[in-house]
C-alpha cells in the first residue's frame, strides 16, 4: 500500500458548489479527486493484499464519509486540500467495516458483485479489512504533510479511535439482542448511535479538527453527524422494503436471514396485534431453524410492517433525525459547505440505495 493521499491535492479546490443532482453528494471535482487518490493508494502493488484492497475499494460507493470530513473541514474554516489524506482514509475505514460486516452477516454480495470474502476467501477478507483500518490511521497522520499541526492530528486520531471502539460496542450490542423481539426502540437507538452514527460523528469532528475549527464548530458538527448517522441507519432499515436489490446492491432478506432487529420490526412488535406479533415470532423462529423460505419470510414481515404502520413511523423518525441534523448547522457561518451538509442530511432519507 502506498499512501499518496495529499500529494496530488490542489490547494485551489473550489469552495463553491455546483448544483447537486439527487444522485450526487459531492461536487464533481471532489469525486474525481477522491477516486484518483484511491487509485494511487494501491497503484503498483503486486501483492495479493494490494489486489484484495483494490477489489474492496472499487467500484466506489456513495463516498458519504469523505464528504462529511471534507465539507466539515471547510465549514469550520479550513481547506479541503489540507484534509484530503484524512478523507481518503475515512473511506478506507468505512470499506473495512463493510468487509467485516459481510463476513459476520454471511452476505455474499456487496455493491452488486461478490463480497470480498466470496471473491478472495474469508481469511484474506479479514486481513484486508484489518489492513484498511490501519491505513485509515496512516492517512490521518499524513495530514502533517499538508501543514496540519501535530496537536490537531492527535486530536483527530483520538476521535476516530473512539469511534472505532464505539462501533465494536454497537456491533456487540446488535449480536446481544439478535432475534430478541422484546428489544425496545430505546435500545435500538443506542445500538445505531454506537454502530453507525459514531463513524459519521468522527468524520465530521475529525474534519473540523484537522481544518482548524473552533471547539464549538467541532461540537456542532459532531451533533450533526450523530443525527445524520441515525437518520441514515433508520432509512437503511427501510430500503429493504422501499427499494430493490438491484438498487441497493445487497440482498433484501439479509436482515431477516440474520434475525437482525430493525426499527420497523421493533415498532411493529410493540404496536401490532397478537396475530401480528405471532407472525413475527414464527418468522424469526423459522429462519433460525431453517424451516421457512427466506422470501416467504420477507413477504410475511413486510405485510405486518405495512399493516401496523411501522414503516411510516420509522420514516417519520428518520426524517426527524434528518431535520435535527440540519438544525445543528444553523450555528455555523453560512457557507456553500454548510449548505451541502444540509443537502446530505436531506438526501440521507430520500435516497433509494
Regions found by a protein language model. Give the residues of each.
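Residues at alpha-helix boundaries and the short loops/turns that link adjacent helices
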Residues: 59, 63, 93, 150, ...
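Short, charged, amphipathic alpha-helical segments
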Residues: 21, 154, 222, 316, ...
Amino acid at each position: 500500500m502506498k499512501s499518496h493521499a495529499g500529494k496530488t491535492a490542489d490547494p485551489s479546490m473550489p469552495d463553491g458548489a455546483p448544483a447537486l443532482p439527487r444522485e450526487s453528494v459531492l461536487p464533481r471535482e471532489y469525486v474525481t479527486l477522491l477516486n484518483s487518490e484511491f487509485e494511487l493508494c494501491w497503484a503498483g502493488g503486486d501483492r495479493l493484499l494490494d489486489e484484495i484492497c483494490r477489489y474492496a475499494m472499487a467500484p466506489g460507493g456513495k463516498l458519504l464519509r469523505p464528504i462529511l470530513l471534507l465539507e466539515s473541514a471547510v465549514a469550520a474554516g479550513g481547506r479541503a486540500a489540507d484534509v484530503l489524506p484524512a478523507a481518503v482514509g475515512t473511506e478506507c475505514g468505512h470499506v473495512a467495516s463493510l468487509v467485516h460486516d459481510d463476513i459476520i452477516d454471511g452476505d455474499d454480495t456487496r455493491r452488486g458483485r461478490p463480497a470480498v470474502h466470496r471473491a478472495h476467501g474469508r481469511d484474506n477478507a479479514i486481513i484486508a479489512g484489518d489492513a484498511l483500518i490501519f491505513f485509515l490511521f496512516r492517512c490521518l497522520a499524513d495530514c502533517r504533510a499538508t501543514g496540519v499541526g501535530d496537536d490537531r492530528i492527535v486530536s483527530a486520531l483520538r476521535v476516530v479511535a473512539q469511534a472505532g471502539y464505539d462501533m465494536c460496542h454497537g456491533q456487540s450490542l446488535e449480536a446481544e439482542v439478535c432475534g430478541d423481539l422484546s428489544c425496545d426502540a430505546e435500545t435500538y437507538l443506542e445500538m445505531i448511535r454506537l454502530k453507525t452514527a459514531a463513524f459519521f460523528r468522527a468524520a465530521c469532528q475529525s474534519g473540523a479538527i484537522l481544518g482548524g475549527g473552533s471547539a464549538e464548530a467541532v461540537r456542532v458538527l459532531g451533533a450533526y453527524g450523530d443525527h445524520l448517522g441515525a437518520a441514515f441507519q433508520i432509512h437503511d432499515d427501510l430500503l429493504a422494503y422501499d427499494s430493490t436489490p438491484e438498487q441497493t446492491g445487497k440482498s433484501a432478506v439479509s436482515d431477516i436471514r440474520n434475525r437482525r432487529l430493525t426499527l420497523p420490526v421493533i415498532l411493529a412488535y410493540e404496536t401490532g396485534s397478537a396475530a401480528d406479533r405471532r407472525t413475527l415470532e414464527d418468522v424469526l423462529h423459522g429462519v433460525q431453524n431453517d424451516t421457512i423460505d427466506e422470501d416467504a419470510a420477507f413477504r410475511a414481515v413486510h405485510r405486518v410492517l405495512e399493516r401496523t404502520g411501522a414503516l411510516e413511523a420509522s420514516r417519520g423518525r428518520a426524517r426527524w433525525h434528518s431535520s435535527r441534523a440540519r438544525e445543528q448547522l444553523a450555528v455555523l457561518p453560512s457557507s456553500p459547505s454548510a449548505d451541502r451538509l444540509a443537502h446530505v442530511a436531506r438526501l440521507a432519507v430520500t435516497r433509494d440505495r
